[in-house]
C-alpha cells in the first residue's frame, strides 16, 4: 500500500473486475509496425502492452476495428487490429490479451468508431454520422446514416463485443466521445435529423443507449462496460451547439441505466479548436468536468487529458473530483509509473514533459508511435529487450550531458558497461538546463535524469572537463559517444555583434559558467562575467526563471526576436507572459513553422491576442542598431522596409551539426557514435532516442 499516494495506489471494483490502482490508459492506435498492413497485431504491440501490464497499469484500453478493412490503399491506412469475426481471435489472444494477462493485468477492447465506418463489404470505408454536417471543412464528407445503416451499425457493434469477450478481453468500451459517430448523434451541432434519432436530447442519445443495452445483452451482467464520452465538446455549427454540462448531467444517469459501469470522460472533439492537451492547460485542469458528473453518477468516474503528475492525481482523488485517472501520455513516458506509485518511488518517476510529440506524430501526421520526449523505447526499440546485457564489458566515454548524452550513459551502464560521463560545465543537463527555464516540465525531467545518474554506480561523472583529442588518448576508451550539442547558426548582418544583442547560446554559456565571447560595452561585459560566475555556483531553473521575469538585464522590457521557430516562439511566449513588448521576426511564411501541430494553434493564437506581441513573417533582417532592427518584409504589394524598435535583440535561429570532436575521436577509438544535436539538430525526443540507440549498439 502506498503511503505517498494512498488513493491513487488503492484498488477499485468495477462490476466483475478489480482495478489494482486508479490509473488506466485511454484508447490508442499506435499504427505501422505495431499492426501489419492487413490489420493484424504484431509482437511489437505485444511488447508495448506487456511493458505497461508489467508496470501495473490497472486497465489498458486498446482500439480495435470491427470491420474487415479490405478496400483501403495499404500506403494510406492507419493500421488497427481487427475483431470482425472469430478468425481474429488467435491474433488478439497472442499479441494483446496474453501479454497483459501474463502480468495479472486487465485489458479492455474499444471497437473503433470515430469518424470512419464501413457498413458492409461492398461499401467503401468513410466518414459517417447522423447528418452531413462538418465542423471543419477539411474534416468533412460525412454521409448521413439511414435507418437501415443505423441497424447495421448496432449489429456490427454487438458482433464486435461478442468476439472480444470470446477472445478473452476483460472489459469493453463504447466510444461515444471525441467526435465519433455516437458523439455526433448526441450533439445538436452535428445532428439535424427529424426522425427518432434527432431533435430532443433523449432522441439524440438514443443510439448510444441502444448500443450500450445491446452490448450488455451480449456480454452478460458481470462483464464491465466502460463508456468514453465528452460532457463538454467545445463545438458548434449553424445547426446548433454541442453538448453543455447541463446536457451532460442529464446524460450520465441515462448511460448508467443502459449498462455503463465506468464513465471514461474526455473533453472536446478532434475538431475542437480549444487547447485541450497542451502545456497551456495545467495538470489536472479537466477534473472540474468529472467533479460535476460525480454529482449525478452512481458509477465510478474517470477523467482523461492532462494527467501527468501523480501528486496532482492523488490530490484530485482525495478531493473527490474523480474516482479513476485516465490518460495515455503518462504511460507512454513511463510504462512503470503505476508500479512506482504503488512503491512510493517518486524520484524514479519519468514524467511526461507535455511536448506532444506522440500526439503530433500519431494524430496530426498519421505516423506510428515511434517518439516520446523522455522514453526512447517506442517503435523498433520495442523489438528487443530494454537493456540487453553486453557480451563484453567496455569502457565507454560519453561526452556531453544533455538528454542524448545522459540517456546514452544510463543505457550503457544498465547494459553492464563502465561509463565515464564528461561535461564541460559545472553541472549536468546540456540544453535542458536552459529549456527548463521556459518549462517546469523540462525542469522535472532534468531532476529525474540527475537523480538516475547519481544513483547508478557504473556512471562516473567528470564536471568542468573539456574533452579534447588528448583527453581521449589518455582515457583510452573502448567506445566514445559524442553528444556535445550543435553549433549556433551564424547570423551575419551589420550590428549582429552589438551590445544589445543576445543569443540562446549566450545563455547556455552563462549557465555553464562561461562568459560569452565578444560582449561589447564595459557594463555589459561586466554583467555577463558576473552573471556567469554567479550562475556557475547558484543556478537552478526556477531561480533563473524568476530572474528572467523580474530583471531588466540582459532582457529589457522591449525585445525583438530574430527567428520564429520553436526556440524563438518559446522565448517569445516567456517575454509575452512577463509583460515585455515583443516582436517575433521570421523569414519563412509562418511564425512557428516547426512547432508541433498540438501546440501551434494555441501558441500563435495567444500571440495574436496579446497586445504586447507583434509577429513579422516573411521578414528578412538587414541590420541591427542600438535602437532596434531594420528589415524587409515581403507583402502582396511587394517588399516593404521596416524598422522594429527594440532595446534587446535576441537571436534564436537554432543549431547546426557539430562533428568536430566526433571526427577527431574516430582515429583514436574503435567505436565512435555521434548523437543528439551535434549529429542532427532536432527536438528532445530525437536526442533521447539517439542516445539510447547508440548505447544499445555498443
Question: Where do the PLM segments sit?
Answer:
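A Rossmann-like FAD-binding core segment of flavoenzymes
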Residues: 443-490, 498-500, 506, 515-516, ...
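Flavin-dependent oxidoreductase catalytic cores
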Residues: 1-399, 403, 407-419, 427, ...
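Structural/interface elements that position substrates and couple domains in central-metabolism enzymes
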Residues: 417, 433-437, 505-506, 512
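A conserved FAD-binding loop/helix module that cradles the flavin
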Residues: 568-571, 595-596, 675-698
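Beta1/beta-strand and adjacent pyrophosphate-binding region of the FAD-binding site
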Residues: 392-402, 553-565
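A short, gly/pro- and small-residue-rich
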Residues: 339-346, 492-512, 663-676
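Glycine-rich FAD pyrophosphate-binding loop
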Residues: 417-430, 581-592
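Short, contiguous acidic/charged loop-to-helix segments that flank catalytic cores in large enzymes
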Residues: 276-281, 385-387, 393, 433-444, ...
